[in-house]
Design a protein with these regions (language model features):
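Conserved SGNH/GDSL esterase-like catalytic core that processes O-acyl groups on lipids
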Residues: 61-162
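Hydrophobic, aromatic-enriched interface-forming segments
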Residues: 168-214
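Histidine-centered active-site loop/cap adjacent to the catalytic His
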Residues: 267-305
Length: 305
């Protein structure tokens, strides 16, 4: 076995072990709530508020293992923040992994992992999750491949090549549709919630271990940082339009959490990721959207700005 194959297999085992540990912790928490409910029924007393249970799949916005750009290693992402919100915080089985593109999130192994999770009743209080949370699309565009979607600045081009970018969005859209189809088979009626990221600054800032993701392509295609910021803005607006089109089809049972324009420049740790306080702002938007849409009970308190 060559070194690349060894590294890949080792990385895969680490991810599988991490997901298994997350699942073990999640199931132990669900079992405690189930036991409390059973005890309340036996004693014929009112049970305390029952938390929502949710399945999360996604990228680094749902699985960010850094504090900004530095140590300590600590999950500060949207799911970590959301799991601490409200008088009865939701219990979220998080299958997300940083760095995953939408095509990876909906690849055969990841779909099989979601199917296993959805079928395991030990993960849910009512046989299936109350919601599925999905973060996908950013890694399909950002990175060394970002230059594919840019015109070279020869003094006449406008920046984002809409034709090439829309073709990439078509692949991302197909991944969302694949998720809806999987949900319809395994957990019919469960709503899917996603988000549209926010407008980053392509300034080359990144953690020590990875990145940058945007400025190298901006430089390669002869654009300035202010011009690059406008290009990234246009790309994310187009991404949101695609998501809103999916949301407009009631059959998709899909809800877009409006996250664009929320973060201030100081909220960004690097080109793609907020500081913990920025992730908390995004999580608060999820909490509000979930509270509005899941009307059978409202375990969330109003988020604090």
């Amino acid at each position: 076995m060559g070194q690349p194959e060894f590294i890949e297999q080792t990385s895969r085992r680490l991810i599988e072990n991490d997901i298994a540990e997350r699942t073990r912790i999640h199931q132990s928490e669900i079992a405690r709530f189930q036991a409390a409910q059973d005890g309340a029924r036996t004693l014929k007393v009112k049970s305390r508020n029952t938390p929502y249970t949710m399945l999360a799949q996604g990228d680094s916005w749902f699985d960010y293992p850094l504090t900004g750009n530095t140590l300590p290693y600590a999950r500060t992402d949207v799911i970590a923040q959301l799991g601490k919100m409200g008088s009865t915080p939701p219990k979220i089985l998080n299958l997300a992994h940083h760095g995953d593109a939408a095509t990876e999130e909906m690849s055969l192994p990841k779909q099989e992992r979601m199917i296993t999770a959805l079928r395991d009743r030990a993960n849910w209080l009512h046989g299936k999750p109350d919601a599925i949370l999905f973060s996908a699309g950013g890694n399909d565009i950002a990175g060394n491949q970002f230059c594919i979607f840019l015109d070279f600045n020869d003094g006449h081009s406008t920046g984002l090549n809409a034709d090439r970018f829309n073709k990439a969005l078509g692949i991302v859209e197909a991944c969302y549709l694949a998720l809806f189809a999987l949900r319809d088979r395994l957990a019919p009626g469960v709503p899917v919630f996603s988000h549209c990221y926010d407008f980053p600054i392509p300034n080359g800032v990144s953690p020590w271990c990875i990145g940058p993701w945007l400025k190298p392509s901006i430089d390669f295609c002869n654009w300035t940082v202010p011009q690059g910021k406008a290009i990234v803005h246009d790309a994310l607006v187009a991404f949101r339009v695609m998501l809103k089109r999916l949301e407009s089809d009631a059959a998709n049972n899909f809800h877009v959490v409006e996250t664009q324009g929320i973060l201030k420049p100081a909220d960004w740790a690097n080109e793609l990721h907020p500081h913990p306080a920025g992730f908390k702002k995004i999580a608060q938007k999820f909490a509000t959207a979930l509270g509005h849409k899941l009307q059978k009970r409202v375990p969330y308190e109003a988020p604090v700005a």
